[in-house]
Design a protein with these regions (language model features):
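Transmembrane alpha-helical insertion/packing segments
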Residues: 1-60
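Cytoplasmic membrane-interface segments at the C-terminal ends of transmembrane helices
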Residues: 3-4, 48-70, 164-183
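Loop-to-transmembrane helix junctions at the membrane interface
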Residues: 58-88
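Alpha-helical transmembrane segments of multipass membrane proteins
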Residues: 19-23, 77-85, 89, 159, ...
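Functional transmembrane-helix hotspots
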Residues: 84-121
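Individual transmembrane alpha-helix segments
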Residues: 128-161
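Membrane-interfacial segments
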Residues: 29-34, 55-61, 88, 92-100, ...
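Cytosolic juxtamembrane helix and N-cap/initiation of the first transmembrane helix
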Residues: 1-17, 150, 154, 160-176
């Protein structure tokens, strides 16, 4: 076999993409608690790394194939998670027009986009921390904001990939054993 990963790992990668879409949509659009995405990155990788090998029916064979399957599915899941997360971030960053519920003080006075997001951070009491980080206006805030977003994205990909490797390792240790030579397997 000359393929880098098994067919089951490719299928698992698609399942991981679906899992990533579900997680990101749930915790950015429905219940906006972004930290949950970071917390779920490692367990998502563990699940998908194990599933990639179970789906491939990798009962026997070299460890490097088992680990490659898990890493592949973990990377695909992590990249999908980050891609969707960044798309949502771009949408909300550049489309922010300063609207705020009247019960919270009404609309923020700002120019649409980065300036409104910057003003929200200032209103939330983060001005001193931003100033210490060298952020003094919407332009410097934009650079700071996206550096932080890409650093977080790298962390999510790393955790999901590490989880994929861990899931593959767990599968390799606890995988079903191949039937003994000459034994009869009953199929129902």
């Amino acid at each position: 076999m000359t393929r880098l990963v098994d067919r089951g790992a490719i299928t698992a990668a698609y399942v991981g993409i679906g899992m990533a879409v579900t997680i990101v949509a749930s915790f950015t659009l429905i219940i906006p608690i972004e930290g949950v995405i970071w917390l779920l990155a490692l367990p998502s990788g563990l699940l998908i790394g194990y599933y990639a090998n179970q789906r491939s029916n990798r009962r026997a064979g070299p460890w490097h194939r088992i680990l490659t399957n898990g890493i592949f599915a973990g990377v695909a899941t992590g990249v999908a998670m980050v891609a969707l997360l960044l798309v949502v971030k771009v949408l909300f960053f550049y489309a922010d027009n300063g609207y705020r519920d009247p019960g919270l003080g009404g609309s923020i006075s700002c120019s649409a986009g980065a300036d409104c997001v910057y003003q929200r951070y200032l209103d939330a009491g983060h001005g001193l921390g931003l100033t210490e980080a060298g952020v003094t206006d919407a332009s410097s805030f934009t650079g700071f904001y996206w550096r932080e977003q890409f650093a977080s994205a790298g962390l999510v990909i790393a955790l999901t990939t590490l989880g994929g490797l861990g899931g593959a390792g767990l599968y390799g240790v606890f995988r079903p054993k191949a039937p003994a030579a000459g034994s009869v397997v009953a199929v129902r």
